Structure formats: C-alpha cells, structure tokens
Design a protein with these regions (language model features):
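Polytopic transmembrane helical bundles with strong interfacial aromatic enrichment
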Residues: 1-499
C-alpha cells in the first residue's frame, strides 16, 4: 500500500506545502495576538464606559478583520493539500490526523464565524455585555482553532494514542485524550499561541509608534502601546518558560532534531549550549535536555551509530539496525496480508507477532540511506538562534517600553518609535523561524519514526506540482500585497470617531 518514491516530486511537494504553510502563518499569529489586545480594550470600555476605549477597540478590530479574512483563505488551501499531494499520509493516519482537523472546522471555525459577525456589526444593536462576550468568543474561537491544528501537528512530532491495523494498513485512534492532551501538544500550544501574542503586541506597538512619529492620535497611540507592552511582556516570559520545557521534550522524543539545532555531532555529558561560534554556556544543553547538568546528550554521530546508554538502561540501536527492523516490519505486513488471503490463521498470527515486535521501526524500512535521517543542520541551527535571539530582544523591548511609560516619557522617545516600527518585521521573522526549527528539524519524517516524507506523498507528475507551486506563489503574493495595501490605508485613515 505504501511505496517509497524517490523523485524530485518529493522535494516539490514539500516546497509547495512549506510555501502554503509559511504564507498562512503570516496571518494566524496576528489574528491570535490582536484578539487578546482588542478584547482587553473593549473590556476597559465595558467597565469604564469611556467612549475612548470603544474607539480604540474598533480600530484594532478593523485590522483584525482584514487579517482574519486573508488568513482563512490561505488556510483552506493548506488543508486540501493533505488529500491532493499527501494521499498516502492521509490514508495511513487519516483516522487520527483527521479528527482534530474536523473538530477545528466544525466547532472552532463556526464559533469564530458566528461571533465575528456580532463583533463587527453588533455595535449599538446588541447589549454591551453581549458584544463584549462576542469579542472574547471570537478570540477564543481562533485560539480553539489553533489548539486543534497544533494537536494535529504535535501528533506528527510525537505519535501517540493509536494502534496499527494490518488488515486496513491504517493507524487507528485508540485514545482521543492521549492525542488531544499529549505533553507535546500542550507545550506546543502554549509556546505557539503565546508567541503569537508577542507578534500581535509588537504589531500594535509598531503601528502606534507610527502615529507618534507623525504626531497624530497621541492619546490613542500611548494607550495602545501600554496595553500591548503589558500583554507582550507577559507572553514573552511565558514563551521562554514553555521553550525550556519544549527543549526537554525534543531531547526525549526527537533527539536528532535537538542535535541538529545545536550542530552537535559528538555528544557527551556536561554539554554546553552554543550561543554562537565559540560562545557557549557551560552545561546548559545537558540541563535543558535532561534537567541534569551532568546529563548525557547524544550527538548526530551517536544517533547514527547507536551504542550509547538510554535513560532506561538499554543500548541505543544504530540507524542501520532500525532500518533492518523496519524492513522486517514491512515484510511481516506483507506476509500477514498474504496469509489472510490464503485464510492461514497460523500464518496471520505469526506475521502479526513479528509486525508488532518491529512496528516502532516501521518507518525506517523506507529509509535507504542512514545519513538521510539527519535534517538540515545549518538551517536548524541558525533558525533556532534567530528565534531565541529575537525572543530575548522582545523581552528587553517590552521592558524598556513599560519603563518609559512609567516615567511618562513614551511619547517623547522618538528613537524608540523608530525601533518599534522596525520591530514589526522582526516579530514575523522570529515566528517563521520557530516553525522552520519545528518542521525542518523533523525531516525526513512526515510522522516521527513512523512515516518518512518519501512514502507519504501522492503519485503525481512533478510538472503538475511545479505548476501549482508557482500558481500558489503568485496567488499568495497577490493576497499578501492586497492585505498590506488595505491595512496601510486603514492605518493612514486612523481611528474613526465613535458614532
């Protein structure tokens, strides 16, 4: 049923999915971040009755709506690719992967679609309390949608809660709770959503700083910056905390990804964390990976050759040994299906036992070159440092803003206004870099240790994938330019007077 395909179609299919995902992710974090900030602003309006906060909230809602609409359009195309370009993947794990996506579409999206209408068109038509609830429920719906998408992605990083059925050649869900609330999913949700709050906060601060540079809307801009900086600092600190927990999980479930992130070829105990070049933090990598400064961290060569001692006391297998076990599993699956056709119960039981024993290595049976399980080290290494470095910068950025706000110097610090304005693209770079680390570091696996990308794709002509790649590239670029143009027009117009 699953056959390894080693052609340029794999690379083009990966490139197309990466293009779609990265364009889509230009819009999602701003939606999540603005939802919280505009919700807080409308809450202040509800509590105080001050029309200033209504005017402020409505302005950011307008930008939220523009961004939300384009994000939905790009997201729909992204989900369709699982059926068009990755049909083997959809067949092999569709029963599991499809569940969170179905919940996201049926529950979360309709929740957003319902309450966003009230949020935009319900002013002066519904009560203040109901409108406030609609605003928060719109944001909650977007966050709930992100939860299920991240559950699906986390399952690809750490597949749990399923059992392989050799009769259908599919993985079937046996524990919904294990899939929905796996430790990887919880940490990924926290890290991703809170980092989106950072991006939303930086966006609000940057746009508000533009007004201060133009000496327009001073009260509106200062108030927006204060709220956004508070949200941003909280989010940045929690994101850093969740990043620490995520490092421990990566070391446990995806050690090759961690080794690539650190460009660590030969592991050991008391491993330092490389900042850049020869600048290292002593024993920090061992502590992050094992919660023990003296802990052993395997490097790329260790993971390829095996032989080191695992935490449970057993010896790690080499990749070649895993490949052999994977081939045994694939052969056992073939034997099982043949025995079933022949109605050979004894043969089925024997093949099933062999399959179960080697199933943890099933995906390795499609790996031809042991070195191919090493992801792009250069890209993983530098993407991780860009993400972490900018994360630390944003913590300092928010602290400086809150300090100047406390000193009542916020509107006078023109240097900071320029810094804030140019920090907007930095927030997007940090967000994209995080996904590069997560996805490039997982390669060559579509599902960690279970299904490599070369066995997950559809049988398509390379030319057709290339054609749709460039169609999507042009279409998404046009959408992005249109969104930026509409946003700039709304920003130049500024907040409207409350009617």
């Amino acid at each position: 049923m699953l056959e390894s395909i080693d052609t340029s179609m794999v690379d083009w299919s990966r490139a197309q999915f990466a293009l779609t995902a990265m364009y889509h992710w230009l819009f999602v974090p701003l939606t999540l971040g603005l939802a919280v900030i505009m919700g807080l602003m409308e809450t202040l309006y509800y509590v105080s009755g001050n029309e200033f906060w209504k005017r402020t909230a409505k302005f950011w809602m307008k930008l939220f709506g523009i961004n939300f609409a384009v994000g939905v359009a790009t997201g729909l195309i992204l989900e369709f690719q699982f059926g068009t370009n990755w049909s083997n993947y959809s067949w092999f794990v569709g029963d599991i992967f499809g569940a969170p996506l179905a919940i996201e579409g049926i529950v979360a999206f309709f929740m957003e679609a319902t309450f966003i209408a009230v949020m935009f068109f319900g002013w002066n038509k519904v009560s203040k309390k109901f409108h406030l609830a609609s605003t928060w429920l719109t944001g909650l719906g977007a966050t709930f949608s992100a939860w299920w998408i991240l559950v699906a992605n986390s399952w690809m990083q750490y597949p749990v809660g399923m059992a392989f059925n050799p009769e259908t050649v599919r993985n079937e869900m046996v524990s919904f709770a294990s899939v929905a609330f796996s430790p990887v999913a919880v940490m990924k949700f926290m890290h991703t959503v809170l980092s989106s709050w950072i991006l939303g906060a930086v966006f609000v601060i940057g746009v508000s700083a533009w007004y201060l540079l133009r000496k327009r809307e001073k009260e509106f801009a200062v108030a927006s910056i204060k709220i956004a900086a508070g949200v941003g600092l909280f989010a940045a600190l929690v994101t850093a905390f969740s990043g620490d927990k995520s490092a421990y999980q990566v070391a446990k479930y995806q050690p090759m990804k961690l080794a690539a992130m650190e460009a660590l070829y030969d592991g050991g105990t008391h491993e330092p964390l490389t900042v850049v070049g020869s600048l290292k933090i002593p024993e920090m990598l061992s502590y992050l990976a094992t919660h023990d400064a003296a802990g052993y961290v395997p490097g790329i060569n260790d993971l390829l050759l095996g032989g080191y001692t695992l935490p449970d006391g057993s010896k790690a297998l080499s990749v070649n040994e895993k490949i052999e076990k994977g081939k045994v599993a694939i052969k056992a699956l073939s034997d099982f299906r043949q025995a079933k056709e022949e109605k050979n119960e004894e043969g089925m039981q024997r093949a099933r036992q062999m399959l179960d024993e080697n199933m943890p290595y099933f995906g390795y049976g499609y790996i031809k070159d042991p070195n191919s399980i090493v992801p792009n080290v250069w890209l993983s290494f530098w993407s991780f440092r860009v993400m972490v470095g900018l994360g630390m910068y944003f913590i300092l950025f928010f602290i400086v803003i809150l300090f100047l706000s406390w000193k009542h110097q916020l509107s006078k610090a023109s240097w900071l206004h320029w810094v804030a304005l140019w920090s907007i693209p930095l927030a997007y770079i940090a967000s994209q870099a995080g996904w590069v680390v997560a996805e490039v570091g997982r390669q060559p696996w579509a599902i960690q240790d279970l299904l490599p990308v070369n066995a997950a794709i559809s049988r398509l002509e390379t030319g057709s994938v290339q054609t749709t790649f460039f169609i999507f590239l042009i279409m998404f670029t046009v959408l992005l330019i249109a969104e930026i143009g509409i946003m700039l027009k709304a920003i130049k117009k500024g907040p409207e007077e409350v009617q």
